[in-house]
Amino acid sequence: MAITRASFAICILLSLATIATADYYAPSSPPVYTSPVNKPTLPPPVYTPPVHKPTLPPPVYTPPVHKPTLSPPVYTKPTLPPPAYTPPVYNKPTLPAPVYTPPVYKPTLSPPVYTKPTLLPPVFKPTLSPPVYTKPTLSPTVYKPTLSPPVNNKPSLSPPVYKPTLSPPVYTKPTLPPPVYKKSPSYSPPPPFAPKPTYTPPTKPYVPEIIKAVGGIILCKNGYETYPIQGAKAKIVCSERGSYEKSKNEVVIYSDPTDFKGYFHVVLTHIKNLSNCRVKLYTSPVETCKNPTNVNKGLTGVPFSMYSDKNLKLFNVGPFYFTAGSKAAPATPRY
């Protein structure tokens, strides 16, 4: 508390001293403002960059030295024994001869019969009767006078005395009632002219093209043995007959090699008329069985015209035979 009172007393004394020493200006002279001059009391700092002295020496890199512990490999050529080739031994297959039964195709649907519809020409009956115009029956007008005939009496007239007592007449337009028009009898125009309908035959439904193919079996007849030939081929020869029985535009199609059962299959897509086509034997890969025979027309060719059903998708021919000798195999094969 003593310190606070002493400091308060010192502040009061200093304020009184400043009031006593203050100059009082006369109200006539305005004060002159002088800007203060600020002089730095401290010198400007001088920047000295720090000097870093490394305390450790720079590292020295010594690359490692790798010493192989293994000796380099020595390559020597392998001494392999020469391969011994043993040719395969082909034995005749011990399969029984297949018995081929040609399938019988029975059409399940009868061919459609197109009949032309009998259309009767339309008869247009008017729904309204034509108007009948009748002349109006008008009775002649008879005018009957309503006045009796005048009686001529001799008037006793005095001489007229003219007195202008009447005003001049005023003419007014008569007001006539509006005319009444009678409606004419109602007349409906006839129906517009309609041309006769043209008959358009019904369009036939779209029938997709039937893909036809040829299939058969090629066998080898060697004595009394008969077995199928794998890799044999047949050919289809198609020609168009010209004048004097001369063929022209002959097309030959070769089948794919037969399978292990001796079966071949050929798809005929680009030939429309199959009646001039024949199926014949072509080649056999078996050296001991390469002579074609005419059994089931294997040489002359099986014509497609012998098939009466034109809706067949697969034509089965054969079986055809190759033989080892020059003699042909029997006409009826025996298994």
UniProtKB/Swiss-Prot annotation:
May contribute to cell wall structure in root hairs. Its main location: secreted. It is found in: Secreted, Cell wall. Residues 1-22 form the signal peptide. It comes from the Eukaryota. Keywords: Cell wall, Repeat, Secreted, Signal. This is Proline-rich protein 1. The keyword Phosphoprotein does not apply. Residues 30-323 are annotated as: 39 X 5 AA approximate repeats. It comes from Arabidopsis thaliana. One of its GO terms (cellular component) is extracellular region. Exclusively expressed in roots, especially in root hairs. The keyword Repressor does not apply. Sequence repeats lie at residues 30-34, 35-39, 40-43, 44-48, 49-53, 54-57, 58-62, 63-67, 68-71, 72-76, 77-81, 82-86, 87-91, 92-96, 97-101, 102-106, 107-110, 111-115, 116-120, 121-125, 126-130, 131-135, 136-139, 140-144, 145-148, 149-153, 154-158, 159-163, 164-167, 168-172, 173-177, 178-182, 184-189, 190-194, 195-200, 201-207, 208-212, 284-288, 319-323. Belongs to the plant proline-rich protein superfamily. ENOD12 family. Pfam families: Pollen_Ole_e_1 (PF01190). The gene is PRP1.
